[in-house]
Design a protein with these regions (language model features):
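Compositionally biased terminal segments of proteins
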Residues: 2-216
């Protein structure tokens, strides 16, 4: 069964809009629906924030974890909150699919953070394979994609978003490293699973994560 999404019922997002409007004070709230996409725009003064909800077509690969806002974020936003979130391995696994596919500087910057923290752990790679299996692009186009010119997205959609500036050349190095290392980290079982998936006969027993196996 497909998990419910805002595409089918946007009422939770409207509720979020009301809650945000109370926090935004005199800010303007705009809910935009374009086909299957629903976006919430919050604007106050010269600042605009876009809340874009990802469609959910699956459950989680790993059990969710309850986490508190880190100390620095709590200091900046003068608040303290805890929420159920994806496990780090699943969060990074899904991020790797985006970084390999669309190659947006934001995704590649997150991969840099991954490399600085723990690198490509077996659990992260396993989650990557799970998300790759559910992606809307062919497996080979993600694993062996051509390099996209990052310059326009870097200048127009990335510069100014990070606390410390980072050069485009650094992100290009991270992308090159990821495209070289990630395919090489796939286990024999993961490779056989993906080959079977492409052939229309996936062997789910080759996957170690319990949820995809139990759901198929």
């Amino acid at each position: 069964m497909l998990a419910p999404s805002f595409r089918d019922d946007p009422r939770p997002l409207r509720t979020a809009a009301v809650n945000v409007s109370q926090l935004a004070g005199h800010g303007k709230i705009h809910l935009l629906r374009e086909g299957d996409e629903i976006k919430l725009f919050i604007k106050r003064g010269g600042v605009q924030v876009k809340l874009e909800v990802n469609h959910v077509f699956r459950g989680t690969v790993l059990p969710v974890e309850k986490r508190a806002l880190n100390a620095e974020a709590g200091r900046i936003f003068t608040t303290d909150v805890s929420a159920p979130v994806l496990a780090s391995a699943e969060l990074y696994g899904s991020k790797l699919v985006a970084a390999m596919d669309r190659q947006h500087p934001r995704d590649i910057f997150d991969v840099l953070g991954l490399y600085n923290e723990e690198g490509l752990t077996p659990e992260i790679v396993e989650c990557f394979v799970c998300y790759l299996a559910g992606h809307n692009r062919p497996v080979h186009e993600v694993l062996f994609s051509n390099d996209i010119d990052l310059s326009a997205a870097f200048e127009n959609e990335f510069v100014g978003m990070t606390r410390n500036p980072i050069a485009l050349s650094e992100l290009q190095k991270v992308r090159a490293r990821l495209k070289k290392e990630l395919p090489a980290r796939l286990t024999d079982g993961q490779r056989r699973f993906l080959i079977g998936l492409v052939a229309g006969e996936p062997d789910w027993k080759l996957m170690k994560c319990p949820h995809p196996v139990n759901d198929n």
